[in-house]
Amino acid sequence: MFSPCTVKEKRSTLRSVAPNPESSVIPPIPLPSRRYKTRHIDALCSLMHLCLLRKDYPRASRAFSLLLRSKSVDISKLWNIGLEILNKVNPEASSEYMERLIARYPARPSINNSYPNRNAEHFFPAYIMLLIQRQEYNKAMKLLDEYLLLPPYNQNPALHEYSGMLCFELAKEEASESERTKWIEKAKYNFSNAGIDVEL
């Protein structure tokens, strides 16, 4: 048995050794250095470009998907690479990819001040060209009719030109002469808005 004095001495010794909860500071958990994160991202970018050069699109797609998961990667700078990969790996997903980009980076300066050169006004013409390449003329025409009513799209000459070309293409598919004439008149109107004179 310990004597009372010995127990008191041991308690006082433990108190002197134990950290004071009021003065103790919990050390921060060490996180990976930003330097290492940057290296990993650079390595993934290099791998993705190498796979694209070798036309290894499935592996390039995996590298791109890993880059998308990183918070420090700005997708608006890599959107065209992502579109190229999707067109090779999963063409059906390309339209959804472009629609999400347009929704994520709206062409409204009050909302999207950080991306003046990478917003929906920049992505939308590429989306229309994608639909034209796939011969989805009706869908492209419907989108243009909707967006050309809104600024800043109605001030984009390229979109008016695309609309004019689509009107000519849709006029070819019309059996009715009156409907064909309507499409041709609409094409002339859009070309004039694009600053192009068309003689028919």
Curated annotation (Swiss-Prot):
Domain of life: Eukaryota
Keywords recorded for this protein, A-Z: Nucleus, Transcription, Transcription regulation
InterPro entries per the UniProt record, alphabetical: RNA_pol_I-specific_init_factor, TIF_Rrn11, TPR-like_helical_dom_sf
GO biological process terms, semicolon-separated: nucleolar large rRNA transcription by RNA polymerase I; transcription initiation at RNA polymerase I promoter
One GO MF term attached to the UniProt entry: RNA polymerase I general transcription initiation factor activity
Entry protein name: RNA polymerase I-specific transcription initiation factor rrn11
GO CC terms in record: cell division site; cytosol; mitotic spindle; nucleus; RNA polymerase I core factor complex; RNA polymerase I transcription regulator complex
General function of this protein: Subunit of a multiprotein complex essential for the initiation of rDNA transcription by RNA polymerase I. Binding to the DNA template is dependent on the initial binding of other factors.
Main localization category: nucleus
Cellular localisation: Nucleus
A UniProt-annotated Pfam family: Rrn11
Keyword Secreted: no
